[in-house]
C-alpha cells in the first residue's frame, strides 16, 4: 500500500516592533515563504500467529522559495527526506499485548523561524529567527504493553520511549536590560528525551463507577548558550492523575479528579535550578430527587506554587438547581464562586522560561433563568 500527496503553503509576514530600544536589533520584518511538498509513503504489513508487523518509509521532496524584502534576500532550496519506521506487536496472551517500535527521521525545515527582525511574544521575551535549510536528525525507540480484561473491567498500560536528536542550531538567550533575547546560532548539539508512564483502571460494578490512576514522567537533556556562556540543561516533569466516578443509586452520581505535577529545571554549568509543584482537585455531585428536579454541586481546589517555597491555595465552589414544569417552563438558579474568592495565581514553565501569573476573579455571582420549551 502507498499513500501519495501534495502539500502547498504560502505565507507572508510583516511586523514592526515599537517601544523597545533600537539598539537591541532590527525591529522590522517583511518577508514571504512558499513551499511545495510532495510525499509518498509506501507501507507493508504482516499479520499472522499473534504477530503484527508494520513497516513504513515516508519520502518527501520539498522546494522552498524565500524572499526577505527588507534584506533584499531571495533564497531557493530543496530538501529530500526519508523516515523509515518499524513497529512489531505480539499478543503474549489473549489479554496481553506488547509493542516495540522505532524509527529514524530528518525533521522538516522549520520555516516558521525564517525571519531576521525581532518579535515580541510577551512583555519581556524577544525572539530572533534564523534562516537555515539544514535538517535536524532524530531517532527513537519505544516499548508499550497493554492488558485488557473486559469482563472484569480491568485495563492497564505502560510505556517507555527514548529519543535522540542532533541539531545544527543551538538555542541562545541573552539578558539585555529588561529584556531576554532568544535566538539561534550555528553550532551542532544533541539532546535526549525520555518518557515513561502507565495507567490502570478498574470498573466498580457495585456502584456503576470507575477508578483509574495514571503516572507520567518526562525528562529532557539539552544544550543552550546564555549570555555567551554555554551550558547543558535538563528538565524533569512528573505527573500523577487519578479519577473516581460512580452512580451508587439512580438519583445520585459523582466524579472526583486529582492532578498533581512537579517540574524541575537545572542549568548545570551555571549552577541554577528551579522547581514548581502544583495540585488540582475537582469534585462534582449530581442529584435528581425528582424526575424534573436536578441539583448540581461542584468544587475545585488548587495548590499552586507562585514562588520558591511559597504556595497559594484556592478553593472554588458552585451550585445549581433546575426544575422543569409540565407546561414546558424550566426554572434555573445558579450560584458561582460561593466562597467569593478574588485572585488566582500559578507558575508555568515553557521551555526554559518560568512565568508566575496572578489573575483577578469575578466574585460571588447569583443567576436566575427561566426557559420555555416548545
Regions found by a protein language model. Give the residues of each.
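Exposed, low-structure sequence patches enriched in small/polar residues
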Residues: 1-374
